[in-house]
Amino acid sequence: MGALPEKEWVPKAPSLRRKLGIMAKVQDEMGHGQLLLRVVEDLMKPYGKTRGDLMDDLFTGRLKFHNVFHMPTRSWADAGMIGWLVDGAAIITQTNMLGASYGPYARALQRICAEEVFHAQHGESIIMALAEGTPEQRAMIQESLDEWWESLLMFFGPASKETTGTS
């Protein structure tokens, strides 16, 4: 699902180098989805569910994923902020699961976490380039941070036990 917010920026990236970088990241994120889908498929077998059932649940809204994957990316700074801070938060939460007792999940996370480090570095590079740019580019960074901050914090859990995914 990590590819959803950034895929729009593949054709809009400001340079060929940036286009290749974001394209590689989106491709990695699609691979992460495939790895995790295989793990989920295996866990669903005892319940008689298939990949098709899972996809139907996703498309109809019965099954959801983290709210950041539903947010639009309005600017190039958003693409950078996702890589730098959202993928950075994912690294923190996912590395805590590297020792999971379920082997297929632990193995998938090893690859995912290794690749997420590159994604965070890529995002940081975008943000640093914008920070060294014009006042408008720096304002774009601030707007992006303001937009993504609250959803980013949800990677670490809700603010209180009264907070839910629909709050």
Which residues make up each language-model segment?
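Internal, conserved structured core segments that host functional sites
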Residues: 67-122
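Short, glycine/acidic-rich hinge or "gate" loops at secondary-structure transitions
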Residues: 17-20, 42-49, 134-135
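His/Met- and acidic-residue-enriched segments that coordinate or traffic transition-metal cofactors
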Residues: 6-7, 20, 28, 37, ...
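A contiguous pocket-lining binding segment that forms or flanks enzyme active sites
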Residues: 104-166
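Structural signal for well-ordered, non-membrane alpha-helices
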Residues: 3, 7, 30, 34-37, ...
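Conserved alpha-helical segments that form or flank metal/cofactor-binding pockets of metalloenzymes
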Residues: 25-57, 123-128
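Acidic/His metal-coordination segments adjacent to aromatic residues that form catalytic metal sites
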Residues: 55-83, 100, 133-137, 148-166
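Helix-loop segments that flank and shape redox-cofactor active sites
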Residues: 2-24, 90-105
